[in-house]
From Swiss-Prot:
InterPro entries: FAD/NAD-bd_sf, MnmG-rel, MnmG-rel_CS, MnmG_N, TrmFO. Its main location: cytoplasm. It comes from the Bacteria. Residues 450-482 are annotated as: Disordered. One of its GO terms (biological process) is tRNA wobble uridine modification. It is found in: Cytoplasm. Belongs to the MnmG family. TrmFO subfamily. This is Methylenetetrahydrofolate--tRNA-(uracil-5-)-methyltransferase TrmFO. The gene is trmFO. Keywords: Cytoplasm, FAD, Flavoprotein, Methyltransferase, NAD, NADP, Transferase, tRNA processing. Its cofactor is FAD. Its EC number is 2.1.1.74. It comes from Rhodospirillum rubrum (strain ATCC 11170 / ATH 1.1.1 / DSM 467 / LMG 4362 / NCIMB 8255 / S1). FAD binds at residues 11-16. NCBIfam families: gid_trmFO (TIGR00137), PRK05335.1 (NF003739).
Length: 482
């Protein structure tokens, strides 16, 4: 029997635990290293694995109309430890999947500790494993220790490891009103269609600034210690520095002409820049913010053209440690400069507990397939939530503006147009219909992926209890939140 090298995993959060589980399912020996309790963080309370720090919610569990719910379902079918333990320790939360934090962490810690192929070690890792140390996955999370962060920065380049994320909201392009917005680059540079522009009159601008100043903000957590710096001020802080600061900053109208009113320059313009290769998502340039999420949606929908905006992601500024993954990682999460290393979890630039665990699941499978020489093992299709998230962080996102991203339907390829009824003109599904059709396609394609020959195919569940809905007759276009 071939003796394979063990897989070393650094970090006992959701991503590291999921990666370890997937590798052990494939029959590999795993060494899982967690620095707590020998070295703690400002945020963690205990020494259990997979400790949920900020919330006990894994968000919506609706697999047909919500992208994170779809990701839940895909992970369940792929034998996810995190989703199995979340189900076992579920607490009432309406349509969300929320868990008893302590029971959840204890159960995952116990499952890994009792697995005969998994060895849990406690201690800080202050350097990246060398080639001779064997294959490794770095899943050290947003609170990576200073020593390991320095080692990662040295290996990737100082500018490639961010310690704070400045997140601007991202809007689904198909929810923008182009009767009011238009495509144009400032001074018509580039191809002239690099930005979407939303104009504001003086009165609209004043009302917008008033709303920003009055909007309810989220405070930094004490342990974040995040300073503001001038290159990344929240939009509401800029407004506090003077009512015209935004009109001379990120909302300046110079070099732009409203084609519907070419003789009158808008008082201000909000620009949105393409955020993914598919062209389905656009980020609001310079709109990083600490406004509460409900306030963001309300206030930003005051902007002409964004009255019915659907947000793939809302903004924020908080402490984080993440790579410029589109530049640094290959499609199987390997560090291009050191391919014996993979990265997983929030450090790759995915945002959220579920997304972190999902990337851990994929990293564990990719590393295992490579160790076992399963060359035919392919990444999940881009039409799935797993594949869409993976594709975004490993190349689909713009490396120049990369910021952490939640899973959302905008990461999946657009649907094809089809007739509402026989003989009718084809159209692309919108709103809830788009989400349902995207989920249906994802689950069908996921089933095909899970059935490919692999170390996991005997235990995966390509066909789960949830029925895969058939394509529905297209009714009137409708909207829904992610």
């Amino acid at each position: 029997m071939t003796q394979h090298p063990p897989l070393t995993i650094v970090g006992g959060g959701l991503a590291g635990c999921e990666a370890a589980w997937q590798a052990a399912r494939a029959g590999l020996r795993v060494i899982l290293i967690e620095m707590r309790p020998l070295r703690t963080t400002e945020a963690h309370l205990g020494d259990g694995l997979a400790e949920l720090v900020c919330s006990n919610s894994l968000r919506s569990d609706d697999p047909l109309y919500n992208a994170v719910g779809l990701l839940h379902e895909e992970m369940r079918r792929a034998g996810s430890l995190i989703l199995a333990m979340a189900e076992a320790h579920r607490v009432p939360a309406g349509g969300a999947l929320a868990v008893d934090r302590q029971g959840f962490s204890d159960a995952i810690t116990r499952a890994l500790a009792e697995h005969p192929l998994i060895e849990i070690r406690r201690g800080e890792v202050d350097r990246l494993p060398a080639v001779e140390d064997g294959p490794a996955i770095i899943a050290s999370g947003p609170l990576t220790s200073a020593a390991l962060a320095a080692a990662i920065a040295e290996a990737t380049g100082e500018t490639s490891l961010a310690f704070f994320d400045a997140i601007a909201p991202i809007v689904h392009k198909d929810s923008i009103d182009f009767d009011r917005a238009w495509f144009q680059s400032r001074y018509d540079k580039g191809d002239g269609r690099d930005y979407i522009n939303c104009p504001l009159t003086r009165d609209q601008y004043d009302a917008f600034v008033d709303a920003l100043l009055a909007g309810e903000k989220t405070m930094f957590k004490e342990w974040e210690g995040t300073p503001y710096f001038d290159g990344c001020l929240p939009i509401e802080v800029m407004a506090e520095r003077g009512r015209e600061t935004l009109a001379f900053g990120p909302m300046k109208p110079v070099g732009l002409t409203d084609p519907r009113n070419p003789g009158l320059r808008p008082h201000a313009v909000v620009q949105l820049r393409q955020d993914n290769a598919l062209g389905t998502l656009y980020n609001m340039v310079g709109f990083q913010t600490k406004l509460k999420h409900g306030e963001q949606a309300r206030i930003f929908r005051m902007i002409p053209g964004l009255e019915n905006a659907e947000f793939a992601r809302l903004g924020g500024i908080h402490r984080n440690t993440f790579l410029n993954s589109p530049r640094l990682l290959d499609p199987t999460l390997r560090l291009k400069a050191r391919p014996h290393l993979r990265f997983a979890g929030q450090i790759t630039g995915c945002e959220g507990y579920v997304e972190s665990a999902a990337i851990g699941l994929l990293a564990g499978r990719f590393a295992s397939a490579e160790i076992l020489d399963a060359a035919s093992f392919a990444p999940p299709p881009p039409t799935t939530a797993l594949g869409g998230l993976l594709g975004h962080i490993t190349g689909g996102a713009n490396a120049e503006t990369f910021q952490p991203m939640n899973v959302n339907f905008g990461l999946l390829p657009p649907l094809e147009a089809r007739p509402v009824r026989p003989g009718a003109k084809p159209r692309v599904p919108k709103g809830r219909e788009r989400k349902l059709e995207s989920a249906r396609r994802a689950l069908v394609d996921l089933g095909d992926w899970l059935r490919q020959p692999s170390p996991w195919s005997a235990e995966d569940s390509p066909r789960a209890a949830l029925p895969i809905p058939e394509p529905t007759p297209l009714g009137p276009a409708s909207g829904s939140s992610e």
